[in-house]
């Protein structure tokens, strides 16, 4: 591993430069994926599944991966069996993750509110859960039982009555999803799992169909969960049919650090997210050139013993990753706010104070003892977060994702009469006189 001794992340030097937020976004590294480019390839898949249901989904799965399960829906007994066979330590860790996530998400549940505007005039905002949700759990480079937890817990807490998990079938497991995925579903009390992945899974969730044994595969009202570029494209296409959480891109970490940060921690955290994907983004923003150099040396040391060294090295060397040098922490705050990272670590003097100045991040991890890996598994927070700068306008998955606010308007005769003149005036101003007539005629005798 001598070549790793010379490993160095690319540098972006923003010192002595005064840049606007838009200029910062242009200067900062960002890879991402071109979803538009694959939409034409994915649309025929979605159309075929919309027309032919499970048959088309199974055909596409077989052509792409060489795997065709006997049925789309995994028999319930296999879920129970997977839980029974789950490693005891993994089960205990999953239970801790579930318990902590439930505690955090329970505090997110909104309550109905009623506003009384005048005697006999009320508007109530009633929060109602989505009725049926499809939760996508990817396959690929890793197994993600944690994604089962992060999708299911907020949906259950919101009160969603019906949910289905879709996850790619695995050849080594008889055309079923990975047993750890099945076990996590069983541990959470979810008994409907579909062995289908990719764009065809999203389409089948959106449009439903009939399984090979004649059982109904009911469509959902909303689809959540991350996936590859084809899954993202399918979600974009299907969003006129169902709701979606977001168009998730490759994972990303930004670390805002000063001279007090430990380069061992910084390097380990950059590597931890680079482990996901060759397109993963790892960005260090610092006012300390000494820390930047020490982090490079520590990256070389740790890469020598990293299991997925090729994948990690590709991610750290990609155009989406860099060490960004800034004049001071104030400039660093402006920089990370412009970047709007999925995960942002603060490793500085007065980390809580600095964190309080952050306005754009999917999740903020404060201090040396709050690594992103904690949030991935057992912090209690949700790890399904906005990527590609979307944290400037969007939030991570939460109980609110699965709730709909419905306004319930109730006026009595006197309350309507009191405001009727204003309604009629505004309807005339908008040249929609029938609106006013609908009120006026109620008071004709």
Curated annotation (Swiss-Prot):
Substrate binds at residues 251, 273, 276, 343, 376, 430, 435. This is Histidinol dehydrogenase. The gene is hisD. NAD(+) binds at residues 136, 200, 228. The active site is at residues 342-343. Its cofactor is Zn(2+). SUPFAM superfamilies: ALDH-like (SSF53720). The lineage of its organism: Bacteria, Bacillati, Actinomycetota, Actinomycetes, Mycobacteriales. Binds 1 zinc ion per subunit. Zn(2+) binds at residues 273, 276, 376, 435. Catalyzes the sequential NAD-dependent oxidations of L-histidinol to L-histidinaldehyde and then to L-histidine. Transmembrane segments: none annotated. The keyword DNA-binding does not apply. Its EC number is 1.1.1.23. Belongs to the histidinol dehydrogenase family. It comes from the Bacteria. Pathway: Amino-acid biosynthesis; L-histidine biosynthesis; L-histidine from 5-phospho-alpha-D-ribose 1-diphosphate: step 9/9. Keywords: Amino-acid biosynthesis, Histidine biosynthesis, Metal-binding, NAD, Oxidoreductase, Zinc. InterPro entries: Ald_DH/histidinol_DH (IPR016161), Histidinol_DH_CS (IPR001692), Histidinol_DH_monofunct (IPR022695), Hstdl_DH (IPR012131). One of its GO terms (molecular function) is zinc ion binding.
């Amino acid at each position: 591993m001598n070549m790793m001794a010379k490993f160095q992340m690319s540098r972006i030097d923003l010192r002595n430069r005064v840049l606007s937020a838009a200029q910062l976004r242009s200067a900062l590294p960002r890879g991402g994926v071109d979803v538009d480019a694959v939409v034409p390839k994915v649309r025929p898949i979605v159309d075929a599944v919309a027309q032919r249901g499970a048959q088309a989904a199974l055909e596409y799965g077989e052509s792409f991966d060489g795997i065709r399960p006997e049925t789309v829906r995994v028999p319930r007994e296999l879920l129970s069996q997977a839980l029974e066979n789950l490693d005891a330590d993994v089960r205990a860790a999953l239970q801790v993750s579930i318990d902590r996530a439930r505690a955090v998400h329970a505090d997110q549940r909104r309550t109905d509110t009623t506003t009384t505007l005048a005697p006999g005039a009320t508007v109530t905002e009633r929060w109602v859960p989505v009725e049926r949700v499809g939760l996508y759990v990817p396959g690929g480079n890793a197994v993600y039982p944690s994604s089962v937890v992060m999708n299911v817990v907020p949906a259950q807490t919101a009160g969603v009555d019906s949910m289905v998990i879709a996850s790619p079938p695995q050849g080594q497991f008889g055309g079923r999803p990975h047993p750890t995925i099945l076990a996590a579903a069983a541990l959470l009390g979810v008994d409907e799992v579909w062995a289908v992945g990719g764009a065809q899974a999203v389409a089948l969730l959106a449009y439903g169909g009939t399984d090979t044994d004649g059982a109904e595969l009911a469509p959902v009202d909303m689809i959540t969960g991350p996936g590859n570029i084809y899954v993202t494209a399918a979600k974009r296409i299907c969003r006129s049919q169902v709701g979606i959480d977001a168009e998730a891109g490759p994972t990303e970490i930004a670390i805002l650090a000063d001279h007090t940060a430990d380069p061992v921690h910084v390097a380990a955290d950059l590597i931890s997210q680079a482990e996901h994907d060759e397109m993963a983004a790892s960005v260090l923003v610092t006012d300390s050139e000494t820390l930047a150099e020490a982090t490079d040396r520590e990256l070389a040391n740790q890469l020598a013993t990293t299991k997925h060294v090729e994948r990690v090295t590709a991610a750290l060397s990609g155009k989406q990753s860099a060490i960004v040098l800034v004049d001071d922490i104030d400039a660093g705050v402006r920089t990370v706010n412009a970047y709007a990272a999925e995960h942002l670590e603060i490793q500085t003097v007065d980390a809580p104070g600095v964190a309080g100045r952050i306005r754009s991040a999917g999740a903020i991890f404060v201090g040396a003892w709050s690594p992103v890996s904690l949030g991935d598994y057992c912090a209690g927070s949700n790890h399904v977060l906005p990527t590609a700068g979307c944290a400037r306008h969007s939030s991570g998955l939460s109980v609110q994702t699965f709730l709909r606010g419905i306004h319930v308007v109730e006026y009595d005769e006197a309350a309507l009469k009191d405001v009727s003149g204003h309604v009629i005036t505004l309807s005339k101003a908008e040249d929609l006189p029938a609106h006013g007539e609908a009120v006026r005629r109620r008071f004709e005798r």
